[in-house]
Swiss-Prot record:
Its EC number is 3.2.1.73. This is Beta-glucanase. Pfam families: Glyco_hydro_16. Disulfide bonds join C63-C90. Residues 1-29 form the signal peptide. It comes from Orpinomyces sp. (strain PC-2).
Length: 245
């Protein structure tokens, strides 16, 4: 199974989304949700719940996903960008199950390096027998004092929004997330709502995914990759809370 997770390069217009609105207060478990709470930690590879990607993604991804780059150290998942005799290698980790509306969160520390992306997102597409729907949290390694939010509905993107964090995400673990509802997506940083989108919201359940990769042909977006290897993004845990019925 090959998953093509195309992420559009930023445009000037993409930085200013017409969907921005005043963020809503953070939902409180037990009131906004029905009490269904699933925490996924990374003490070891749970093969019944997760899978490691093992293929080249092509296009702007200048590396090959390999399970060798998905490691578990000190209770954390480490996704590494490296190189072998065939070229650059990178890491991607995903759930086997699909998740719909609800609160998605990750505690992570991204890579600080030009030309690379560290991410947390939901995705489903043609390789899953569905339309392409996706919701993204992406760190562009050239400047980890900001984070990019984005989403795709039936393959239609251009919803990029840059949020300035007020800290360097690569220097420590922080919690990032999004609350996906039928008519909106609200993104969070350390429990505080920072951005909401309302336009053409995706509706297809997707897999929870994380990856770290180096780009090619997207220098305007990521800045040129400098060839540095053995660099890693770290993930402490992810969680999913289902909404109240």
């Amino acid at each position: 199974m090959k998953s093509i997770i195309s992420i559009a390069a930023l445009s000037v217009l993409g930085l200013i989304s017409k969907t921005m609105a005043a963020p809503a207060p953070a939902p409180v478990p037990g009131t906004a949700w029905n009490g269904s709470h699933d925490v996924m930690d990374f003490n070891y590879h749970e093969s019944n719940r997760f899978e490691m990607s093992n293929w080249p993604n092509g296009e702007m991804f200048n590396c090959r996903w390999t399970p060798n780059n998905d490691k578990f150290e000190n209770g954390k998942l480490k996704l590494t960008i490296d190189r072998d005799g065939s070229g650059y290698t990178c890491g991607e980790y995903r759930t086997k199950n699909y998740y719909g509306y609800g609160m998605f969160q990750v505690n992570m520390k991204p890579i600080k390096n030009p030309g690379v992306v560290s991410s947390f997102f939901t995705y489903t597409g043609p390789s899953d027998g569905t339309k392409w729907d996706e919701i993204d949290i992406e760190f562009l390694g050239y400047d980890t004092t900001k984070v990019q939010f984005n989403y795709y509905t039936n393959g239609q993107g251009h919803h990029e929004h840059i949020h300035y964090l007020g800290f360097d995400a690569s220097q420590g673990f922080h919690t990032y997330g999004f609350f996906w509802a039928r008519n909106s997506i609200t993104w969070y940083v350390d429990g505080t709502a920072v951005y909401t989108a309302y336009d053409n919201i995706p509706d297809t359940p997707g897999k929870i995914m994380m990856n770290a990769w180096n780009g090619i042909g997207v220098d305007d977006w990521l800045r040129p990759f400098n060839g540095r290897t053995n660099i890693s993004a770290y993930y402490d845990w992810v969680s999913y809370d289902a909404p109240r019925n």
